[in-house]
Structure formats: C-alpha cells, structure tokens
Amino acid sequence: MADVKFVKPKNINGHFVKIKCRDCGNVQVVFARPSSTVTCNICGATIAKPTGGILATSGEVVEVL
C-alpha cells in the first residue's frame, strides 16, 4: 500500500467542505474541523483526519460551504 499524503487546505472559512475521494471520485460533505477520521462512503478510504484544528485531507477540496 502506498503512503497517502495528507495536506491542510488553505482558506477554509466555512464549517463544511466538499471533498473528492482520490480513489473512487466520490464527493462528500465533511466538517472542516473533525474530531475523528473520515472515510469515504463508497470505497472506505480515509479522506480526512483531525489535526487539532482544521482537517488534513488526502482528497481534493471541491467547494467550501
């Protein structure tokens, strides 16, 4: 299994973000400051994890809500 790089996106002022899974392309709404790991509803891959503040994501931020 390859290492997945998680990055903290910039300019997230909203409370929710739409994130696109890099494995299956599914787009789902995620809280911008999660307290637990977020997995994709379709393939089960980890798409976001908590960092003590803003989320760290392995997918693409599609939209800030």
From Swiss-Prot:
Q: Which cofactor does it need?
A: Zn(2+)
Q: Where does this protein hold Zn(2+)?
A: 21, 24, 40, 43
Keyword Iron listed? The answer is no
Q: Which PROSITE patterns match?
A: RIBOSOMAL_S27E
- Return the SUPFAM superfamilies for the record: Zn-binding ribosomal proteins
GO CC, sorted alphabetically, is: ribonucleoprotein complex; ribosome
User: From its record, what is one biological process in GO terms?
Assistant: translation
**Residues forming coiled coils:** none
User: What Pfam families does this protein's entry cite?
Assistant: Ribosomal_S27e (PF01667)
Task: Recall the GO molecular function terms of this protein's record.
Answer: structural constituent of ribosome; zinc ion binding
- Alphabetical list of InterPro entries matching this protein: Ribosomal_eS27, Ribosomal_eS27_Zn-bd_dom_sf, Ribosomal_zn-bd
Q: Where are the zinc fingers (C4-type)?
A: 21-43
Keyword list, A-Z: Metal-binding, Ribonucleoprotein, Ribosomal protein, Zinc, Zinc-finger
| Cofactor binding, per record | Binds 1 zinc ion per subunit.
Oligomeric state and interaction partners are given as: Part of the 30S ribosomal subunit.
Similarity remark: Belongs to the eukaryotic ribosomal protein eS27 family.
HAMAP family in the record, alphabetically?
Ribosomal_eS27 (MF_00371)
Q: Report the protein name in the record.
A: Small ribosomal subunit protein eS27
- Which organism's genome codes for this protein? Thermoplasma acidophilum (strain ATCC 25905 / DSM 1728 / JCM 9062 / NBRC 15155 / AMRC-C165)
